[in-house]
Amino acid sequence: MASRSAGTLITHNNATYIPPALMPGYRGHIPTASFTYGDTYGSTSARCFQDFRSTVLNSSRSPYCQGGQFPTGNASDPALVIGHRARGWDRFLHSPSWSRYNGDFKRAQELTQFHKAAEQHRDHYRDKSGSVHQVPHFIVPVKNPETFPLPQQVL
């Protein structure tokens, strides 16, 4: 008899049984956990998960949220709430300097400029009247002095 009519699993030790719905997702290898003789990896990780779950339930938030503090509409910290911030011109003085993504902004700006140039080139290509000017970036036969200027021409 492995299960009851209610669907709960009967184990030899019900105090350590954690229902799968309450168990957190895989959080990787636990290097801080010391494995003792006779203690399996599963029971040690289950103990670690249970400790993590109890700390989250006791504090009502994840202990891993001390990383990036991003403004939200609802937060336990009043300084993070967007409605708490200044609404006048002073809001630009304290504008955040962080970004949520690790991006190369100079490269993103170059790509934006290239996209605009490509759109202008497309407009020139579609133009039948000849009134739209060419984009110099896309003129293929480039003269040698434009690409490799002589040292006396650079001055």
From Swiss-Prot:
One of its GO terms (cellular component) is axonemal microtubule. Keywords: Cell projection, Cytoplasm, Cytoskeleton. It comes from the Eukaryota. Transmembrane segments: none annotated. Coiled coil: none annotated. The keyword Transmembrane does not apply. It holds the Pfam family CMI2B-like. Microtubule inner protein (MIP) part of the dynein-decorated doublet microtubules (DMTs) in cilia axoneme, which is required for motile cilia beating. This is Ciliary microtubule inner protein 2C. It comes from Xenopus tropicalis. The gene is cimip2c.
